[in-house]
Regions:
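Bacterial N-terminal signal peptides
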Residues: 7-15
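Sec/Tat signal peptide C-region and signal peptidase I cleavage site
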Residues: 16-20
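Positively charged n-region of N-terminal signal peptides that target proteins for export
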Residues: 1-4
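SH3/SH3-like (including bacterial SH3b) beta-barrel domains
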Residues: 40-60, 64, 116-140
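Boundary regions of SH3-family modules and the immediately adjacent low-complexity/disordered segments
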Residues: 21-27, 33, 43, 47-50, ...
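Short alpha-helical segments in extracytoplasmic peptidoglycan/chitin-binding modules
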Residues: 38, 55, 73-74, 114, ...
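Short aromatic-glycine-enriched beta-strand elements
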Residues: 67-72, 142-146
C-alpha cells in the first residue's frame, strides 16, 4: 500500500518538476500596437484571453511548453517596473504568446556561446556578449534553449543559466 501511495505522489508531482526544469524566463518586447495579446491557444486567430498595455511598463513571463512558435505562459505575469504580479485570467485552456514578442538578453560580462546543438562540445555558431543582442526563444531541451537573434541572422543553442530575463538591468 505504501508503494502504491508513493508511486501516486511521484506521478502527480512529476509534471510540476518537468515544467520548472524546462521553463524559460523572458520578457515581452512588443511595440507593434497599444496592447500585447495573450491568447487562449497557440495560434494567431485564437481568442484573446487578456491584453497587456505596451506603454505601461515591462512584463516578465515564465514560458513552458512551445508549439508552432507559440509559448505557453506558466504562472503569472510580472510588471517589472512596479514589481507587481498580474494574474492570468480569461482562459480555461492556457495562455499563449508568440515567440516573436518575447525575448531575453545574455547574463554577465563573459563571452557566451551559441552552438549548433545543445551540447558544450557542439561547434560554435556565434560568440555573443551581454549588451550586444536580443534573443528570441524557439525551443527548450533540458538546460538548453534554442534561440534566434533579433535580426534573424543567427540561430543556435545556449545554456539557460546564461540568459537574462530582466529588461531593466543586466544580470550578473
Amino acid at each position: 500500500m505504501k508503494k502504491l501511495f508513493l508511486l501516486l505522489v511521484v506521478a502527480l508531482l512529476l509534471p510540476v518538476v518537468a515544467v520548472a526544469q524546462n521553463a524559460v524566463p523572458a520578457y515581452v518586447v512588443d511595440s507593434k500596437g497599444p496592447v500585447t495579446n495573450i491568447r487562449t491557444a497557440p495560434r494567431a486567430k485564437a481568442r484573446v484571453a487578456m491584453t497587456l498595455p505596451t506603454d505601461k511598463g515591462s512584463y516578465e513571463v515564465l514560458l513552458g511548453k512551445v508549439k508552432n512558435g507559440w509559448w505557453r505562459i506558466e504562472e503569472s505575469i510580472y510588471e517589472a517596473e512596479e514589481n507587481q504580479e498580474i494574474k492570468l485570467h480569461g482562459s480555461k485552456t492556457g495562455y499563449w504568446i508568440h515567440n516573436s514578442i518575447v525575448a531575453f538578453g545574455v547574463a554577465g560580462e563573459q563571452e557566451n556561446f551559441l552552438r549548433t546543438k545543445p551540447s558544450t562540445r557542439a561547434p560554435l555558431v556565434k560568440v555573443i556578449h551581454s549588451d550586444q543582442i536580443l534573443l528570441h526563444p524557439l525551443a527548450v531541451r533540458g538546460k538548453w534553449v534554442k534561440v534566434v537573434t533579433d535580426d534573424g541572422k543567427y540561430t543556435g543553442w545556449m545554456l539557460l543559466d546564461r540568459i537574462c530575463s530582466n529588461s531593466l538591468t543586466t544580470c550578473p
